[in-house]
């Protein structure tokens, strides 16, 4: 398995420790499958959510992040606390990092401090569309 680090340069020691521990309980084939899955994970893109009122929607987002290999999910809890619904996340919350932030400003400052560009959805016509957004320009949230 490669060093668990992605193109944005963020090491993932917690995940490496989990896999090392679990490797003693699985076959070599299963271990190889797990290593391939980890090698495909990324921190180059991360997902943020803010004051999620419906925990089932936020919990579904956790599952989507895990399914698409997004290693981090950020939750702003200024008005609503985020607690994953175990019936919806189905254990996927154990494989991604959920980072909680008290305010949107703190989240943005933290991500920018780590070199992320901040991207948001907006109904404005003059902004970039997904087709014109430069994914290769650096990590984004």
Residue ranges and their predicted role:
Residues 1-141:
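Post-transcriptional modification and biogenesis factors for structured RNAs
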């Amino acid at each position: 398995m490669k060093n668990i680090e992605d193109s944005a340069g963020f090491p993932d020691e917690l995940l490496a420790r989990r896999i090392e521990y679990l490797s003693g309980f699985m076959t070599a084939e299963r271990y190889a499958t797990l290593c391939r899955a980890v090698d495909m994970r990324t921190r180059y893109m991360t997902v943020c959510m803010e004051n999620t009122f419906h925990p089932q929607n936020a919990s579904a987002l956790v599952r989507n992040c895990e399914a698409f290999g997004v290693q981090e999910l950020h939750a702003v809890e200024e008005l609503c606390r985020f607690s994953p619904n175990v019936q919806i996340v189905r254990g996927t919350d154990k494989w991604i990092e959920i980072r909680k932030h008290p305010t949107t400003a703190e989240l943005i400052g933290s991500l920018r401090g780590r070199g992320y560009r901040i991207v948001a959805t907006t109904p404005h016509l003059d902004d970039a569309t997904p087709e014109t957004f430069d994914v290769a320009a650096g990590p984004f949230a």
